[in-house]
């Protein structure tokens, strides 16, 4: 390992890739908004299901596009069980 490599600047590829993914998601949202919402809903449910049992019928995901901002709203009803504290 060279000492010069240790102090070299990190590449910007990961940051550029993340920005491109956000841009592509935003572009796709304008064309197929309902498809994106459905995919996001399933992915969010999969992540939450790892930690809490959730009734899939009680999950509502909506996306609203304004002139300058797009809002993603996720409404999930999580049942209270013994041993689970409210936030």
UniProtKB/Swiss-Prot annotation:
GO term, biological process aspect, one: regulation of division septum assembly
Q: What protein name is recorded for this chain? A: Cell division topological specificity factor
Q: Which organism is it from?
A: Rhizobium meliloti (strain 1021)
Q: Identify the keywords attached in UniProt to this record, alphabetized.
A: Cell cycle, Cell division, Plasmid
Task: State the source organism's domain of life.
Answer: Bacteria
Q: Which Pfam families match?
A: MinE
Q: In which family does this protein belong, per the annotation?
A: Belongs to the MinE family.
Function per UniProt: Prevents the cell division inhibition by proteins MinC and MinD at internal division sites while permitting inhibition at polar sites. This ensures cell division at the proper site by restricting the formation of a division septum at the midpoint of the long axis of the cell.
Q: Which InterPro entries match?
A: MinE, MinE_sf
């Amino acid at each position: 390992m060279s000492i010069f490599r240790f102090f070299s600047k990190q590449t910007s590829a990961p940051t550029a890739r993340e920005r491109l993914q956000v841009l592509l998601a935003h572009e796709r949202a304008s064309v197929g908004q309902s498809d994106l919402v459905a995919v996001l809903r399933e992915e969010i449910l999969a992540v939450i299901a790892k930690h809490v049992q959730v009734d899939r019928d009680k999950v509502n995901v909506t996306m609203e596009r304004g002139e300058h901002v797009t809002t993603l709203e996720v409404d999930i009803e999580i049942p209270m069980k013994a041993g689970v504290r409210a936030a």
